């Protein structure tokens, strides 16, 4: 039986939320693991465990038992979470992965920028 791992708790009893450098909808490249080199879109960010779910990356197969009498079992494929340190933001224009930095625009907004290309993300 597999059990879900409980997130770390702070001194006040609240779960710790890690700062994750990617957001939902970002295009990322996998830099470590079995799917190294693949590029995909972030579907979900899990800040309590510092993981992200990327489209068509880290695919697992689950064998599901039949729920009702006449129903047959199924094999379901789904994306599993991958640690946020194993992904890097990807520029679709220049086809290169890069770290990010935070800069301010002329009107004073704080935005994320790719270090290699200088491309502003949001």
UniProtKB/Swiss-Prot annotation:
The keyword Cytoplasm does not apply. GO terms for biological process: translation. GO terms for cellular component: ribonucleoprotein complex; ribosome. Signal peptide: none annotated. Pfam families: KOW, ribosomal_L24. Keywords: Ribonucleoprotein, Ribosomal protein, RNA-binding, rRNA-binding. InterPro entries: KOW (IPR005824), Rib_uL2_dom2 (IPR014722), Ribosomal_uL24 (IPR003256), Ribosomal_uL24_CS (IPR005825), Ribosomal_uL24_KOW (IPR041988), Translation_prot_SH3-like_sf (IPR008991). One of its GO terms (molecular function) is structural constituent of ribosome. CDD domains: KOW_RPL26. SMART domains: KOW. Disulfide bonds: none annotated. Belongs to the universal ribosomal protein uL24 family. Part of the 50S ribosomal subunit. One of two assembly initiator proteins, it binds directly to the 5'-end of the 23S rRNA, where it nucleates assembly of the 50S subunit. This is Large ribosomal subunit protein uL24. It comes from Trichodesmium erythraeum (strain IMS101). The lineage of its organism: Bacteria, Bacillati, Cyanobacteriota, Cyanophyceae, Oscillatoriophycideae. The gene is rplX.
């Amino acid at each position: 039986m597999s059990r879900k791992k409980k997130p770390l708790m702070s001194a006040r009893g609240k779960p710790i939320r890690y700062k994750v450098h990617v957001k939902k909808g970002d295009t990322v490249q996998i830099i470590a693991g079995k799917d190294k080199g693949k590029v995909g879109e972030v579907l979900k960010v899990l800040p309590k465990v510092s993981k992200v779910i990327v489209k068509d990356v880290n695919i697992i197969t689950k064998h599901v038992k039949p729920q009702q009498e006449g129903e047959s079992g199924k094999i379901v494929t789904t994306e599993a979470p991958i640690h946020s340190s194993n992904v890097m933001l990807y520029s679709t224009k220049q086809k290169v992965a890069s770290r990010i930095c935070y800069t301010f625009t002329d009107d004073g907004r704080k935005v994320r920028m790719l270090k290699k290309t200088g491309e502003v993300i949001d």
